[in-house]
Amino acid sequence: MTTNQRSIKAPQTVVVKLGTSVLTGGTLALDRAHMVELARQCAELKKQGHSVVIVTSGAIAAGREHLGYPALPNAISSKQLLAAVGQSRLIQVWESLFAIYGIKIGQMLLTRADLDDRERFLNARDTINALVENGIVPVVNENDAVATNEIKVGDNDNLSALVGILCGADKLLLLTDQKGLFTADPRKDPNAQLIKEVTTIDDTLRKIAGGSGTTLGTGGMATKLQAADIARRAGIEVIIAAGRAPNVIFDSLSDEPQGTRFLALEEALENRKRWILAGPAASGDIVIDDGAVKAVQTKGSSLLAKGVVRVQGQFARGEVVRVLDKQSHLIARGIAAYSNDELAQIAGKHSKEIIDILGYDHGSEVIHRDDMVVIQE
């Protein structure tokens, strides 16, 4: 079947995440021949009326190649040096390859700080949407040259999920050096079977994903599973597929794609809750009892002080926190109505007691249900 015969009928916004292993083919240099093929497929998508956003790895590999593979110490500063040199080289390669098909690109470098603050989050969203609306392909990467651990997203798998939320994507393609998610590591177990479709992400699946990435990249199957979970909750279908297979982008978007397809949740989150889910790094944790877990998960209730067991970390009123059960399983993310100091005083108390304990109150809810995203299946 030809590329044109694989045409996708309904216009879609597609985020294509390209890992280092896909761009280098396992070598130490960018594989421009394969990159031009990926650009061709993206160009074909645009010709058919779809919008394409690229999340690209490879800056460090490009920097190492450009500098002649220097022997550098294994330090953050070395990686930032390589990223600083390589990012410009990487974007030049993409610019030249897309130019073959008459397509202009726009570079966007993001850090966690750009997503933590809602106003900056919305500004990033407006920029990426403006590029798409003007026929320009956004090429996104994390700003590794300046990002520290405190402001890093950490890997381009999770970054691509956040970008998908920013641009309201219909599909997210996580292209990697594996054919998809298997029942075991196919590099170690010859009996490993490809999982074709996923409707629920549970602890068993997380255990299967395990492991880390390649020596050149930062992401492995575990981070892809995290990214898939974030994206599908925002109404984005996710496909993990082999990035060097022929016509992989078109095959991934067919009715029966190669690889593993993660179905989007039917009830997609509203925009504010998408930001709570994807934007800010959690400032602290609120541990709740079993009754509160049931109320939050099954009844859609707000979290009250009565159900709080303890707090962990430091956070101010209005910051995003994680909600955990007593076994430290993630139950929800939400915006705290009280600081950690305030919560420590009112934990386990009835709402009517708050004003007597603190001398004031910010309402009866510790986290209002409109400010909370339930995570557990």
UniProtKB/Swiss-Prot annotation:
Amino-acid positions noted as binding substrate in the UniProt annotation, renumbered to this chain: 57, 144, 156
GO biological process terms held by the UniProt record: L-proline biosynthetic process; proline biosynthetic process
UniProt xrefs under Pfam families: AA_kinase, PUA
Coiled coil: none
Pathway entry: Amino-acid biosynthesis; L-proline biosynthesis; L-glutamate 5-semialdehyde from L-glutamate: step 1/2
PROSITE patterns for this protein: GLUTAMATE_5_KINASE, PUA
Subcellular location: Cytoplasm
PUA domain boundaries: 283-361
Enzyme Commission code(s) on record: 2.7.2.11
Protein name per Swiss-Prot or TrEMBL: Glutamate 5-kinase
Organism expressing this protein natively: Vibrio cholerae serotype O1 (strain ATCC 39315 / El Tor Inaba N16961)
